[in-house]
Swiss-Prot record:
Belongs to the Ycf2 family. GO terms for molecular function: ATP binding; ATP hydrolysis activity. CDD domains: RecA-like_Ycf2. ATP binds at G1344, S1345, I1346, G1347, T1348, G1349, R1350, S1351. It is found in: Plastid stroma. Coiled coil: none annotated. Pfam families: AAA, Ycf2. InterPro entries: AAA+_ATPase, ATPase_AAA_core, P-loop_NTPase, Uncharacterised_Ycf2, Ycf2_N. One of its GO terms (cellular component) is plastid stroma. Disulfide bonds: none annotated. Gene3D superfamilies: P-loop containing nucleotide triphosphate hydrolases (3.40.50.300). Keywords: ATP-binding, Nucleotide-binding, Plastid. This is Protein Ycf2. It comes from Cuscuta reflexa.
Length: 2003
């Protein structure tokens, strides 16, 4: 993966570097200068930090690199796009509309009326909306004022509560099915169309509440009014009609509700005190790190309706994790779970996916009404937790975590018509009545349900009632059938009869349940033997409880009938008889029972593993603690109940014995859980401090400073931050907590639990007091509060705060936790105070004081005067405030406050209000108190505050890269942006117009919206959008608007969307304008078509079209990329649309074009981009040649040329899409077919009346020649495209005769005119006979060795011609089933006559014919490919390929066909079919001599392999041989390549020291690569003239880029290595050779590409022979210099050796030196000794001479073996390998790292293999081996083309495709056997020692004989092994063992003198270089400066390297 990423980076860099090669881009590049300057600055660290200065940033935006002013339009556009990108990122990565303000399950709308109460009366606030109605639960009833019934009976005085009277009940997975979904959607549409209107509709669907029912809602604080998403919201729509008589007990209406506030206030204080203590004491974080812990499969079969009880789910997860977790992990989890059971209000842990689930009926109104007045002393901390969490937001939180949880929809069906009554019970025994009422309400709830799971859950809840001494069975009679229902608690039967009588009995259902259980356990056998005992104990207790403690239902019925009457029971029976029948089906019972047993089994397993969890459980059912009531334990059977609990695992302890945490106390009896005596496994391991810190008092009415309380220790600790110096501050702190949370209740009542869950999930861990981050002082300390770590006033930091200031940061953080996201502190003080006024309008004194205390303070301390004024004005003593009696009585008990409350100095850490804001608040304070609001705000004050905040942002900008500074700056920036949006919303009226228009559009469209999009819209967000206009209109009114409508994040989101729409609206019309302008031009041009009726114009136009065929204009490639981007944008929008609509769309509906564009324009490299540069052509000749044609005809001709053939393009698209997407096409053939399908008849036009080759002239004056064959082929193509190929000259005509002679002599004898114009007749021309064939040849065979540029020549001709160019790949036609040859009649191909051809004369019919038959042909091809297993079908396909290509070529004639590597079509049994077809087509084309003009060019580098049938007079009858490029030809080639792309060479280029001195490789590919590099540099430098320095830079860049191809290492010592190489080159080589480029580096570069053997041999030959110019010693010194410099200059380190050996070039220097010495010995030692070296005596170095001649074969063998590194061949590696200590992967990696870059196999005579025939014909079958992997059985096919390589990994070790090329012995995870190794021919008489031995390589002996012997007849046997494995499937170890063994033998045979010679040479070289570097002290600095100046090194690299 790392290598792939590296390759991608390298390719991207090349693309970006050469992307400027398009000349159109040169103009647009100037527009990017400002962006380029910014990019340039980003790479300089010191400049980058300066960007944070706004002045510098503004200058950069206004200037470009040249210092001139930049394009303002471009700058503005760039800034707009940048802002758009930032907004998109912000929307995606931040909750712009906070999720806490949205309903988490908002798939359906919650009925919330848009109208707000005009008055502040309580009655009007109740019915307005859910939120308003629920918000009154904290309000205080005015003294002596009751709720009037008139309000409920008069609809005109109320606001409508829109309810849904028809609802379906189904799980979420079934929402999209059935009629119930239609009902929901219908209700949803009705809701959307009526819920948000400003006025009540004419016929509103309003169900009003009776006063008693309203009181029922008020009295039950845990009841929420929500119609969806919870099965516990059963009472939602049980409202009665106004006309019905109420049966409510009206005496409850007169009771005030002050007890709610009183009890709540005290418990809030208790809870918050403990929370603040935990914040200081413990580091609060989540335990769970296992993602499996938090995730539950959505359709887990074990997750049934039981797990709606969160404890069930918890036990299930415990049971699962017990198999994997260690004992310590289970201990930690159990400890936390113990706390969760004992103090759940303090534990919210997402790891358990558990929170306290407050039942809707858990704290009924009657209990509060009766018990709260008495202020009983035995209430525990959690008693009022249902008040805190009254809105059951845990439902939302729990549903998000447990994905399986089924969301239920409360259902009602015409309740008003059935005239139901709300049942309210008033009984002295409150709990009994509550349970009875819950039973009846549950029965009513399921009246229309038909879902078994829903009813099952309902009965679960019913039997989990809070009565442990009672179990019910309810028998209903109304039918003769009775079916048992199994529940985990009891067995219930329902018998329904017609007489509607009641009979209630208890059954012995436990026996049947136990029988099933025993049967189940017996089947499990041994697995449950241990657990069976636990089962028996539980069922015994269950039987005792069910048989002895039964309370007959008849008694319960009597009690209820006294208060309710018989009508309710009749209604219940009627409903049950209609709705419960589905539940009693046998299938449902079976499913229910199976689920029950599965759960029981898991629970018993959980208990058996010593995980005794301290929770209340009954039988085998654990019961959630919030659903447990112990109020009846004082009855006569309490002893039995206690025994039951103790037997299950709980110990009942009285309070007098211990003081543990209270579970719940309603009466005088105390029921407590002891957390430390039940399980010895856990009792001693739970820290005592946990229970001590969480213990609470038994009497909550006492003050907080009680000494015997555990909590009192927290507040009386002097070293504790919660204990301020003065008691006054303590009360102030307590008050701040209360006030903050009070405001929380008032603003977001239903989200407080979600915040607690989010903020306080913790595991117990002692926090560390850190003294770091003291830079920002108080700011950091305050900020760290949110990370739940305190360091305030701890240790030495105590001096930061004085006595008064100690409490201020704490109070401010209390406010910051709960206030800022609700009361956004912005400059819009009018908006803030308006919100506060809403709260002040309510009769709540404490809230008023909290607002003054928190809001009216600022970041700066108040003066004494200000404090006095505020206290006198707002903070009056309690006695001076008109408190109600109940509040006056209760207030001192729960809050120790006096008249001096004290003003908190609040530092809003995320706002930092300025002093102006503070004074502004003070000024507005009086108006707030009096109820007056200012409706306008001064413009200057708003923007001045905004500017001050912006200045504050600039001040802290340098601290952006610190974590604290980043958070702070983010807050400031978000605040500024939000404030700016709010200011603009009041200044710009267009936004309101947009809102109004959007509102009207949405009103119309919403009713027509598809069903599936409505289910995806979040209801609250939609509600906010629709109400936005109404909100702005009532912005200054006093109304209870939901706070999230006022939040700045919402408006930021809203205006961001508007901004993005404006940007999109700008881009869209721009392109629409372009389209409209093009359309208008088209209309103008169409008018000229009328002139086509004139015959003269028609004739002229036909002439023009014949001479100048219409062509496609060159399109800018960036335009195509833009089209791709637009298509991708369209695709993404369709995907988003499909996702939003619930469709399964994966891609676009028409994704063909995107596929084509991606393939065509994104898979491009630098060379392809350069090839896109158009050629410079003049159009003057066109005007000259068409001067006699009328203007009208020219205009029509231009119109036709511009016209795009829509039909033809459609055909191309259809063909190409079918080829690209059809699965029936093989991958090998896909590229070939795509090429054919993309061909069109319209090509680029060149002026054919002029000479098309402008490059044959030699304007430079320097000798540049072309090869004769290239000249002939170029003129032949020119004649062909001028339609002269089939022209029959009339030799009797003198004019035609002269023309023909001129052309013939020019073509035939052009090779004699070197350096002259090719049209000049040579004076020494040979006589010419007119009897020869007058027409030129149509078949050309181009031969030449690899590297001569055959493919480049043909492609060059194709580029300069305007006729179609078709490539035919012969290897695609090879028949892989030769046994079918006899079944195919080749003569059938002769039946193809002219009628099958496509007539090109009538171009208009071509498209029609293709269009008509295209679908049939494509269908036929698909069908044919699907039946390829058929023999005849395979033969037909083989025939189709060759036929299709030639038929297309004939249809598109004149065209050129190129067949590379035609020698593959040899005469043999496997490809005779394709060869015969090819010969047949060539013969037919030649014999016809029809107007079909096809020029066939074939190329090969092995002419001996070409079949004689192809070389015939009427086939490939002309042979052109290309030789290696000479120096003048290289220059010509370079000149041509550069000139065709619009670049020229400077005049002094051809001087002696200029271009002539630069040596380019003889390979054509080298010249092309160099040309591309030069052009990329020229375009970057904006030069059109190429100079010598540019070419040298390109050469050096190619050499220097070596370091990017070697794998990257962290060792920067390679810089010294590079400098050392440069020093040695500059000192030793450049002065002698005048060659500034290191030849060894060029050799390495060429070796990496393996460019050719002769080229390599040339270098070695120069080393051995040209002693006057270069010596081997200099090269040895140059290769060694890098390592020596690295050793001398680099600092020693622990990994010094690793640093040296980790770099490829450093390691290969040694291999290169050794190879040079071996080569020198092979060339010099074999030919001469000391005495016969007279030719080189003067310059010869005696050090390198041999005392005696050596065997050249031994020297060559040793030289080729130098590829193996000495470190790898050491005895250590051998021993490690033999012992198995060295992994094969390590050996393979070492081989790759240290072998690839070495001169792997040197073959001095390898270049001769081209010239002499290869009798074995290795080149043919070597293709079968290419890419064959020995280690992996995988085939790597390559195209037979000169430009293809074999690449391996990122090293790009490339191997040329040729018979005797150098193939590397090693590749990444591959071994390539080189059959063309010249050593095969050298060592024919003995086993080849340099390569693998035959027996160890081949799997078949016969195969090895056929490959390794010189018997030509054995070639035929090769095809038998075509599909067999060539190599032995050996393991890696055997290969490495063989290599080591072979190298050991070679090393043993080598002479000792050679090894000593190496040592002496290298040691002397090292000594010489050391002295050189040490003596030249300034040399390092000079070379460093030179490298920096040449930009070969960069300062950052030097800084890293020299530090």
């Amino acid at each position: 993966m790392r290598h792939q990423v590296k390759v991608c980076i390298l390719e991207l860099r090349e693309i970006m570097r050469e992307i400027h090669n398009y000349y159109y881009f040169l103009d647009s590049w100037t527009k990017l200068n400002s962006v380029g300057s910014l990019i340039h600055l980003f790479f300089r660290q010191e400049r980058f930090f300066k960007l944070f200065d706004t002045r510098i940033f503004s200058i950069l935006l206004s200037r470009n690199l040249q210092g001139s002013p930049s394009n303002r339009y471009f700058t503005i556009k760039g800034v707009i796009l940048f802002v758009a990108g930032v907004l998109i990122y912000r929307i995606n990565n931040q909750n712009m509309v906070e999720r806490k303000s949205l309903h988490l399950t908002g798939l359906f709308p919650i009925p919330m009326n848009s109208t707000e109460p005009i008055k502040d009366r309580l009655e009007e606030a109740i019915g307005s909306s859910n939120i308003n109605r629920l918000s009154i639960l904290l309000l205080y009833f005015p003294k002596g004022k009751n709720i009037s019934e008139r309000y409920f009976l008069n609809p005109k005085e109320t606001t409508g509560v829109i309810t849904i009277t028809k609802k379906g009940s189904m799980p979420e997975s079934n929402w999209n099915s059935g009629p119930s979904f239609k009902i929901l959607v219908t209700d949803f549409i009705a809701y959307l169309t009526s819920a948000f209107r400003e006025k009540i509709p004419k016929n509103p669907m309003i169900n009003l509440m009776f006063p008693g029912e309203m009181e029922d809602f008020i009295g039950n604080p845990t009841r929420s009014v929500r119609p969806f998403c919870s099965d516990r919201w059963s009472e939602l729509h049980l409202w009665t009609n106004p006309t019905e008589k109420s049966t409510i007990d009206h005496k409850f209406v007169k009771n005030p509700l002050s007890f709610v506030r009183g009890a709540e206030n005290k418990e809030i204080m208790n809870l918050l005190r403990i929370i603040t203590y935990l914040q200081k004491t413990f580091s609060i974080h989540s335990i769970s790190s296992d993602p499996r812990w938090d995730s539950v499969p959505k359709h887990d079969p074990d997750m049934d309706s039981f797990q709606k009880n969160s404890l069930f789910f918890l036990f299930h997860r415990f049971h699962e994790r017990n198999r994997f977790e260690s004992e310590e992990r289970l201990q930690e989890m159990t400890e936390l779970f113990t706390l969760l059971i004992s103090e759940p209000d303090l534990v919210y842990h997402k790891g358990f996916s558990f929170s306290i689930y407050i039942d809707s009926y858990g704290l009924e109104k009657k209990k509060l009404l009766n018990e709260a007045r008495a202020e009983s002393k035995n209430k525990s901390l959690w008693v009022l937790s249902p008040i805190l969490f009254r809105y059951e937001e845990i439902e939302y939180f729990f549903q998000r975590i447990i994905q399986k949880r089924v969301r239920w929809i409360s259902c009602g069906n015409g309740l008003a018509d059935l005239k139901q009554k709300m049942v309210v019970f008033a009984s002295k025994n409150i709990m009994e009545a509550v349970n009875q009422s819950r039973l009846i309400q549950n029965m009513i709830q399921i009246k229309s349900s038909t879902d078994d799971g829903y009813i099952r859950n309902l009965f679960n809840r019913f039997f989990l009632l809070k009565k442990y001494d009672r179990n019910f069975e309810y028998r209903m009679q109304g039918d003769q059938k009775g079916t048992p229902i199994f529940n985990q608690r009891t067995l219930m039967k329902c018998r329904i009869k017609q007489d509607h009588t009641y009979l209630y009995k208890w059954s012995d259902g436990t026996q049947s349940l136990q029988e099933h259980l025993e049967h189940f356990l017996s089947e499990q056998k041994s697995g449950f033997k241990v657990q069976k005992r636990y089962f028996q104990v539980m069922f015994d207790q269950l039987r005792i409880c069910m048989t002895k403690n039964l309370i007959h239902w008849f008694e319960v019925r009597k009690k209820v009938e006294k208060k309710v009457g018989k009508n309710v029971y009749k209604l219940v029976i009627l409903l049950l008889s209609k709705s419960l029948r589905f539940f009693f089906l046998p299938q449902s019972l079976h499913f229910f029972f199976i689920k029950l047993l599965r759960f029981v089994t898991k629970f018993i397993l959980f208990l058996s593993n010593s995980l005794t969890i301290f929770c209340v459980s009954f039988g085998n059912t654990p019961i959630q603690r919030s659903e447990i009531y112990i109020s009846e334990l004082k009855c006569s059977n309490k002893k039995l109940c206690n025994q039951l609990f103790e037997s299950i695992g709980f110990q009942i302890v009285h309070l007098k014995k211990l003081k543990p945490l209270l579970l719940e106390e309603y009466d005088t009896y105390n029921f407590v859980i002891n957390g430390g005596t039940r399980s010895p496994f856990l009792s001693n391991k739970i820290p005592k401090r946990i229970f001590d810190s969480l213990s609470t008092r038994t009497n909550h009415s006492k003050s907080f400073d009680k000494k015997d309380s555990c909590l009192s220790k927290i507040f009386h600790d002097k070293d504790n931050w919660l204990n301020p110096p003065k008691p006054f501050h303590t009360s102030s702190l307590i008050s701040s907590f209360y006030k903050a949370n009070k405001l929380r209740f008032r603003s977001h009542l239903h989200h407080f639990l979600f915040y607690c869950n989010k903020r306080f999930p913790f595991s117990v861990e002692k926090a560390r007091n850190t003294n770091s981050h003291y830079i920002y002082g108080q700011f950091l300390n305050i900020l760290l509060f949110r990370k739940k770590r305190f360091s305030l006033c701890v240790g030495e930091k105590k001096h930061v705060f004085w006595s008064r200031a100690t409490i201020s940061p704490i109070e401010s953080q209390v406010s910051n936790i709960f206030i800022p996201k609700d009361f956004i502190q912005s400059d819009d003080k009018e908006y803030n105070l308006d919100k506060y006024f809403n709260f002040l309008s309510q009769p709540d004194t404490v809230i008023r004081r909290a607002i003054y205390s928190i809001v009216e303070t600022s970041g700066t301390p108040l003066t004494e005067t200000q404090k006095g004024d505020l206290e006198r004005t707002y903070c009056q003593p309690l006695s001076d405030i008109n408190l109600y009696d109940s509040e006056v009585n209760n207030f001192p008990e729960y809050l120790n406050l006096n008249s001096n409350m004290g003003l908190a100095h609040i530092l809003f850490s995320d706002k930092y209000l300025s002093s102006e804001n503070h004074s502004l608040c003070l000024k507005k304070g009086a108006d707030v108190h009096k109820g007056r609001m200012s409706t306008t705000f001064q413009r200057d004050s708003s923007f001045s505050i905004l500017s001050e905040k912006w200045n504050l942002f600039q001040t802290y900008l340098p601290s952006f890269f610190t974590s604290t500074g980043y958070k702070y700056l983010t807050l400031i920036f978000g605040d500024n942006f939000s404030d700016l949006l709010l200011i603009l919303s009041r200044r710009v009226s267009i936004f309101q117009e947009i809102l109004g228009l959007s509102w009207r559009i949405l009103q119309i469209r919403l009713s027509k919206m598809p069903l599936f999009i409505r289910s995806e819209i979040s209801s609250q967000w939609l509600h906010n959008i629709l109400l936005s206009k109404e909100k702005i209109r009532r912005n200054t009114k006093s109304s209870l608007i939901s706070t999230h409508l006022r939040s700045t994040k919402f408006w930021e989101f809203f205006y961001s969307i508007i901004f993005l729409l404006l940007v999109a609206g700008y881009l869209g019309p721009i392109y629409i304008f372009f389209v409209s302008r093009a359309f208008s031009e088209l209309q103008t041009e169409l008018k000229s078509l009328k002139s086509l009726r004139i015959p003269s114009s028609t004739i002229e136009l036909r002439k023009l079209l014949d001479k100048y065929p219409r062509s496609e204009p060159n399109s800018f490639w960036l335009k195509n990329i833009f089209l791709v981007v637009m298509e991708q944008l369209r695709d993404s929008l369709e995907e988003i649309k499909g996702f939003a609509f619930g469709l399964n769309r994966v891609g676009p509906t028409s994704g063909v074009n995107s596929i084509r564009f991606k393939n065509k324009y994104f898979n491009i490299n630098g060379i392809d981009i350069i090839d896109l540069i158009p050629f410079a052509h003049t159009r003057i000749a066109f005007s000259i040649n068409t001067r006699h044609i009328s203007h009208t005809s020219k205009e029509i001709y231009s119109l036709i040329r511009k016209r795009k053939n829509v039909n033809g393009v459609w055909i191309d698209d259809k063909l190409e899409s079918w080829v690209a997407n059809s699965d029936s096409i093989h991958e090998e053939e896909r590229k070939f077919l795509v090429q054919l399908s993309a061909l069109t008849t319209e090509k680029r036009i060149l002026l054919s009346l002029t000479h098309s080759d402008h490059f044959s002239k030699n304007d430079s004056g320097y000798q540049m020649i072309e090869q004769p064959g290239a000249i002939y082929l170029r003129y032949l193509v020119d004649i062909h495209q001028k339609h002269l190929m089939n022209y029959e000259f009339n030799t009797s005509c003198l004019a035609e005769r002269r023309i023909f002679l001129a052309h013939s002599q020019t073509i035939t004898y052009s090779q004699t005119s070197y350096g002259t114009n090719s049209f000049h007749f040579p004076s020494h021309g040979k006589p010419f006979s007119l009897r020869l064939a007058l027409s030129p040849s149509r078949g050309i065979l181009v031969i030449g060795s690899i590297g001569t540029g055959r493919s480049y020549l043909v492609k060059y001709l194709a580029t300069n011609s305007y006729v179609p160019f078709i490539t035919v790949f012969p290897n695609k036609f090879l028949d892989k089933n030769p046994q079918f040859i006899d079944d195919i009649d080749i003569d059938n191909s002769n039946n193809i006559d002219a009628s099958d051809d496509i007539d090109m004369d009538n171009s208009d019919n071509i498209d029609d014919d293709i269009d008509r038959d295209l679908a049939t042909e494509l269908e036929l091809l698909t069908w044919m490919n699907a039946l390829t297993m058929d023999r005849e079908m395979k033969a037909e396909i083989a025939r189709l390929f060759i036929t299709l290509q030639f038929e297309l070529a004939r249809a598109m004639s004149p065209c050129i066909i190129w067949i590379p590597n035609i020698h593959d079509l040899d005469v043999n049994e496997s490809n005779y079919l394709s060869l015969g077809l090819l010969v047949n087509h060539l013969s037919r084309d030649c014999e016809r001599c029809s107007p079909i003009n096809i020029l066939v060019i074939a190329s090969t580098h092995i002419p001996q392999k070409v079949d004689p049938a192809l070389i015939a007079p009427k086939k490939l009858n002309t042979c052109i041989k290309l030789r290696r490029l000479l120096i003048p030809q290289q220059r010509k080639y370079f000149f041509t390549l550069s000139y065709t792309r619009g670049f020229h060479l400077e005049n002094k280029m051809f001087h002696t020291n200029g271009f002539g001195s630069i040596t380019m490789g003889p390979n054509a590919r080298d010249i092309v690569a160099l040309t591309n590099e030069v052009l990329s540099i020229s375009i970057t430098q904006k030069k059109s003239i190429i100079d010598t320095n540019t070419i040298r830079s390109a050469l050096h860049r190619q050499t220097w880029d070596l370091q990017s191809q070697v794998r990257l290492v962290q060792d920067h010592e390679i810089l010294f290595y590079q400098i050392g190489r440069a020093v040695a080159q500059n000192v030793l080589i450049s002065n002698l050779s005048n060659c500034p480029i290191d030849p060894i580096s060029i050799y390495l570069k060429n070796k990496s590409c393996n460019e050719g053997d002769s080229y390599l041999y040339k270098w070695y030959f120069e080393l051995g022979t040209s002693m006057k110019k270069l010596t081997i010693l200099l090269y040895l010194l140059s290769c060694t210099a890098g390592s020596v410099a690295q050793d001398l200059w680099s600092l020693p380190g622990p990994d010094e050796k690793n640093g040296i050996t980790s770099y490829g070039l450093v390691e290969n220097d040694s291999d290169l030196v050794h190879g040079l010495l071996e080569v020198e010995g092979a060339l010099v030692g074999s030919s001469r000794t000391e005495k016969n070296c007279s030719k080189f005596e003067n310059d010869r170095v005696t050090l390198l001479l041999r005392p005696e001649p050596r065997n050249p074969l031994e020297r060559m063998q040793n030289g080729s073996c130098s590829i193996l590194d000495q470190r790898f061949l050491s005895e250590k590696y051998e021993s490690e390998f033999e012992e198995g200590a060295l992994a094969p992967q390590q050996i393979e990696e070492d081989l790759f790292n240290h072998i690839v870059w070495a001169p792997t196999i040197w073959r001095p005579w390898g270049f001769l293999c081209i010239e002499r025939p290869n009798e074995l014909g290795f080149s043919y079958w070597s293709r079968s081996f290419r890419g064959k992997r020995i280690l992996y059985d995988e085939e790597d096919e390559l195209e037979e083309n000169d430009s293809e390589f074999l690449q391996s990994g990122t090293m790009q070790y490339k191997t040329r495709d040729r018979s005797s090329k150098e193939k590397g012995l090693f590749r990444i995870s591959q071994f390539i056997w080189d059959p063309a190794d010249p050593l095969f021919f050298l060592f024919k008489d003995r086993p080849p020692g340099s390569v693998f031995s035959r027996l160890e390589l081949f799997a078949d002996e016969e195969m090895s004989k056929g490959l390794l012997t010189s018997q030509t007849s054995q070639i035929e046997h090769l095809f038998r092994y075509k599909y067999t494995r060539w190599f032995i499937n050996k393991t890696q170890e055997k290969h490495f063992e063989f290599l080591i063994h072979r190298q050991r033998c070679l090393r043993t045979n080598s002479s000792l003198s050679n090894r000593s010679f190496r040592s002496n040479t290298l040691s002397e070289s090292y000594q010489y270089l050391s002295n050189l570097f040490l003596s030249n002290g300034t040399l390092l600095d000079q070379m460093t400066k030179t490298l920096l100046r040449k930009r070969w090194l960069f300062p950052d690299e030097m800084k890293i390297g020299f530090m």
